[in-house]
Every structure is written in C-alpha cells, then in structure tokens.
C-alpha cells in the first residue's frame, strides 16, 4: 500500500467502497424484484428475502416519527463518517484489524446515509425469522457491515485491554 505514512490506513477505503457498492446494488435489485413486504422464502422457518422501508434507525427506532428523524440520523451518519475517516487516517501500519473494522462501519454508514438522503428511508431486504412466531427486524448489507465492524471494534478493545497494549495486526 503506497504512502501509508502520509495517508495512514486510508488505502483500506477500498473496503468501504466495496461495501457501499454491494449494498446499493443489492438494494436496487430487491426493489426491482419485490413488492413491499413480499417474502421469498430461502430457508423455510428461518430466512427470507423481503422488501421493507425503514424511516427510523436500527430496528425501526423512531420510524413512526413525523420525519425529523431522517435529518437527525443523516447528521449523525455524516459526523460519525467524518470521525471514522480521521481515525483511519491516523492509524499506524500494524493496525490492520482496526482499519478493516472502521472501513466496514464506514461503508455501511455511507450506504444507509445515501438511502436516507436520496430516498427518505433505508431499504431493507433480509429477514431472519423462526417458524412465523419470531421475526428479527429486516436489515440490509450496510447494517451487516456495521454490525461486523462494530463486533471487530469490540473484540479489538477487549484484546487491547486484556494484554495491556494495542492488539492490532
């Protein structure tokens, strides 16, 4: 990776771009193929494709509000994204695990931010459920990238705290 010292770990932004592109392509595909709330069962009693629009935050938090939440969540995503870019830029060469985690979170945040700004809602299409009795809120690839990145960040902090020094690499 050229000029890592000058650009920190910014070369890892290719992961951010990949997450963003795959997220947007998958959302476009499911919007073209499914009608609202239509389900295509992939694994009976466990996993389906569906189409849902979320005007709130994760797990539809504040989805029933009057619309102000769109701008609040967009502002939060912009601020968090800027912080993540600065954090990525300041990482040292051996902090690969952390760079990947931050790039995943950033890609997911930007994917959902794009939806929120352009469409006014986030497009969700993955539905995990159990025998028509329990349904996890629908989500998308951006949400998945944010979750994986956040778990990686938590593991990184746990490993760092346990050993007493940064556990990157």
From Swiss-Prot:
It is found in: Cell inner membrane. Its EC number is 3.4.23.36. PROSITE patterns: SPASE_II. GO terms for biological process: proteolysis. Belongs to the peptidase A8 family. The chain crosses the membrane at residues 10-30, 40-60, 68-88, 94-114, 135-155. It comes from Pseudomonas aeruginosa (strain UCBPP-PA14). Pfam families: Peptidase_A8. This is Lipoprotein signal peptidase. HAMAP family: LspA. The active site is at residues 124, 143. InterPro entries: Peptidase_A8 (IPR001872).
